[in-house]
Amino acid sequence: PPGSTYKMVTTIAAIDSGTISRWTEIEDEGVYTRFEDAGYMPRCMLYTTTGATHGLINVMKALAVSCNYYFYEAGYRTGITAIDNVAKALGLGEPTGIELPEATGRRANPETKKELYDEGHDGWYDADTVAASIGQSENRFTPLQLCSYTAALANRGVRYTATLLKRVLSSDYQKLIRENQPVVASTLDISDEAYAAYSEGMREAVTSGTAYSAFVGYDVAVCAKTGTAQHGSGGSDNASFVLYAPADDPEIAIAVYVEKGAQGGTLGTIARDILTAYFSEAGSTDTVPAENTLN
């Protein structure tokens, strides 16, 4: 599962369905008791680890500190249809279009649940929506899909087909033989308010939230989101980390996923090293090193 890197999906769906505004506050009570009678009481990670809560917060702060409780309630109010529509438009559970065989993953929704379980299973519950809203349930995506999704967030809903090939030059670099042009794979009309909510929340994750330690004193403004996902197979949780940068004029999107990597915040240093390489002189793509050529 993608874990909390999925929360931007829920943010967009909740705001653009009119369910919340970016200023709507929800009280984090630690334990989500809406489904207590059914024995399902998920917890916010902060409460699980420290016994504390995030208190009364809006969606931007909830993204920055990765408050599960906020997104349990926002997802419940929004419903799975709106959430799933946003996830699909942003490329999650969809082919990226890369020139290699790829897994398409799957999105948590009633159709997926019906396919995965036998006919005796009695359908989709609101509790399923709550789990899906924080990137759990049946959500399963490839790292490339997470990267494509993050790039679409940076592009305010425009998702491009993924490709490995930028251009083909002659052996002496003097002739352009072929150059790939960007191809739009899908678009999502994201409102100004929803864009402001997730971009500011991801920025705050870096300046004061769960991604802070990896980017202290970093020269480039970064928007990022950490993710920690339970997988049910024992051992540490899976960890994910996504970012785009620069925050105000994005050039690059990065996704890092480590199975049993414990917490997404620990992957920030990996993403930072990639970002540093990209923005360094050595990371320039204007020229092609000889070892990357075919004669």
Predicted regions and their residues:
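Short, gly/Ser/Thr-rich active-site loops of penicillin-recognizing serine hydrolases
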Residues: K175-A185, R272-N295
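Short, charged, low-complexity patches
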Residues: L146, Q263-R272
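Beta-lactam-recognizing serine transpeptidase/beta-lactamase-like catalytic domain environment
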Residues: P1-S4, V9-V256, L294-N295
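Ligand-site clamp/hinge motif
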Residues: V258-G261
